Amino acid sequence: MATGFFTHNRCLSEDEGSTSLDRPERIEQIHTLMQASALARRVQVYEAKTASEADILRVHSPEYIQKLRDLAQKGAALTAETLVTPELLEGAFLSAGAAVEAVRAVLDGSLKNAFVCVRPPGHHAGRNFGGGFCLINSAACAVRAATQVLGCRRVALIDVDAHRADGSENIFAGDASVLLLDSFQATAFPYGVAPATAANVTNMPLDDGTLGREALARMEAEWLPRLYDFAPDLSLIHI
């Protein structure tokens, strides 16, 4: 079975501004490096379809989604750093659709595994809020599709982005079908290191200058026992 590569053209066409960290160039660079290394010939490429309303509302409240649509019509900001335009909101729905379809293809046996290469990002978006360039939590949409539609009893969401997955924690805290393991730079956005809010969440703040091998050693010591005990049917890694 092949590895799936899920993406969409909106990733490359909409910019949040010259000072934004979420820029089309980061997706372009991945495509360029894949072509240079011949990885592109070893994956099956899928152009994402937009997520359904049901996919989105398993994660976000109707009021929040309406707020995003209202802001998009004005081209207004959700937070100081997070712009909402029709194009960015369309991209967020496509990114969620890519994540859901990737999980569906893995679970039905069409693919061995999948890489979802999309923007805008999502893990700072909670049930009723967004921020940090995140509008829709695409990983959360994929997890909820897996547990509520596709038959998974347990899903592990492993987040190793430099920033804390505050949106994902807001969505999944207390959900016994999901194990959230989150490592992040302790001094980075969203600022302040709060303890995990539920037993199914493990936060691993890392000090500035932590080496990769040091972080890996902590993950092996603190996370692997939890993963073995949880025995997930599916694991998602947010990078």
Descriptions of predicted regions:
Residues 2-146, 152-153, 205:
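Metal-dependent C-N hydrolase catalytic cores
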Residues 100, 104, 115-236:
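Conserved alpha-helical scaffold segments that buttress catalytic/binding sites
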Residues 239:
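Calmodulin-binding IQ motif helices
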